[in-house]
Amino acid sequence: MKFQYKEDHPFEYRKKEGEKIRKKYPDRVPVIVEKAPKARVPDLDKRKYLVPSDLTVGQFYFLIRKRIHLRPEDALFFFVNNTIPPTSATMGQLYEDNREEDYFLYVAYSDESVYGK
């Protein structure tokens, strides 16, 4: 997926910012969250998040669901590198395994469980 954040900010800027954030907040991880193309869910009011490393993916789902005002019966799926992460994983684990060279973790969200549909 093409992330708008990457389009808006050159790599060097993102990397410098990511390094600065990691130094200043070593117990938190910088995450970029954007809606997947063709997803039929609302847009987020912001796309950059600084989340505690020990927050689980499941807890992060809850936060994002709240921000986009999803009803309990509405589906929401996260994709990290085109894969749905386990809800029991911590954001810190997910970050360590999937962060990009600019020190950000990129997460796409959708109402479909198949990426890009």
Curated annotation (Swiss-Prot):
Q: Which GO terms describe its cellular component?
A: autophagosome; cytoplasmic vesicle membrane; endoplasmic reticulum; Golgi apparatus; microtubule
> Where are the bilayer-spanning segments?
none
CDD domains in the record: Ubl_ATG8_GABARAP_like
Where a lipid (Phosphatidylethanolamine amidated glycine) is covalently attached, the residues are 116
* One Pfam family named in its UniProt record: ATG8
Residues carrying lipid (Phosphatidylserine amidated glycine)? 116
Keyword Repeat found: no
Q: List the disulfide bonds.
A: none
Key words of the record: Autophagy, Cytoplasm, Cytoplasmic vesicle, Cytoskeleton, Endoplasmic reticulum, Golgi apparatus, Lipoprotein, Membrane, Microtubule
Q: Which domain of life is it from?
A: Eukaryota
List, alphabetically, the PANTHER family matched.
MICROTUBULE-ASSOCIATED PROTEINS 1A/1B LIGHT CHAIN 3-RELATED (PTHR10969)
Q: How does it assemble?
A: Interacts with ATG13, OPRK1, RB1CC1 and ULK1. Interacts with TP53INP1 and TP53INP2. Directly interacts with SQSTM1. Interacts with ATG3, ATG7 and MAP15. Interacts with TECPR2. Interacts with TBC1D5. Interacts with MAPK15. Interacts with TRIM5. Interacts with MEFV and TRIM21. Interacts with WDFY3. Interacts with the reticulophagy receptor TEX264. Interacts with UBA5. Interacts with KBTBD6 and KBTBD7; the interaction is direct. Interacts with reticulophagy regulators RETREG1, RETREG2 and RETREG3. Interacts with IRGM. Interacts with DNM2. Interacts with NCOA4 (via C-terminus).
Q: Which family does it belong to?
A: Belongs to the ATG8 family.
| The protein, known as | Gamma-aminobutyric acid receptor-associated protein-like 1
Can you name the source organism?
A: Pongo abelii (Sumatran orangutan)
> Which gene carries the instructions for this protein?
GABARAPL1
